[in-house]
From Swiss-Prot:
GO terms for biological process: defense response to bacterium. This is Alpha-defensin 11. InterPro entries: Alpha-defensin, Alpha-defensin_C, Alpha-defensin_N, Beta/alpha-defensin_C. Keywords: Antibiotic, Antimicrobial, Defensin, Disulfide bond, Secreted, Signal. Residues 1-11 form the signal peptide. PROSITE patterns: DEFENSIN. Belongs to the alpha-defensin family. It holds the Pfam family Defensin_1. Residues 14-46 are annotated as: Disordered. Disulfide bonds join 56-84, 58-73, 63-83. The lineage of its organism: Eukaryota, Metazoa, Chordata, Craniata, Vertebrata. Paneth cells of the small bowel.
Length: 85
C-alpha cells in the first residue's frame, strides 16, 4: 500500500488509448531514471531497507531484467512505463 501511494504522486494511472499507446514506442527516446524516496525525519517503519533501495526508471520499450511495471510516467505528451526493482 505504501509503494502504491508513492507511485500515485509520481505516476499517472495506466490508460490504454490508441493515442497513448502510439507515443510509448518513440524510437530514439532514452530511458529516464526516477528517484523514489520513502520515510520521514523521525525514522518510522517506512525506513525499511526494501523500500529505501527501490530504484525506478521511465522506460519507453518495457521493463528489463528484474524490474516490474508499477505504473506510467510522462514527459510532455509522451507516456512511458514506470519500471522498478
Amino acid at each position: 500500500a505504501l509503494v502504491l501511494l508513492a507511485f500515485q504522486v509520481q505516476a499517472d494511472p495506466i490508460q490504454n488509448t490508441d493515442e497513448e499507446t502510439k507515443t510509448e514506442e518513440q524510437p530514439g527516446e532514452e530511458d529516464q531514471a526516477v528517484s523514489v524516496s520513502f520515510g520521514d525525519p523521525e525514522g518510522t517503519s517506512l525506513q525499511e531497507e526494501s523500500l529505501r533501495d527501490l530504484v525506478c526508471y521511465c522506460r519507453s520499450r518495457g521493463c528489463k531484467g528484474r524490474e516490474r511495471m508499477n505504473g506510467t510516467c510522462r514527459k510532455g505528451h509522451l507516456l512511458y512505463m514506470l519500471c522498478c526493482r
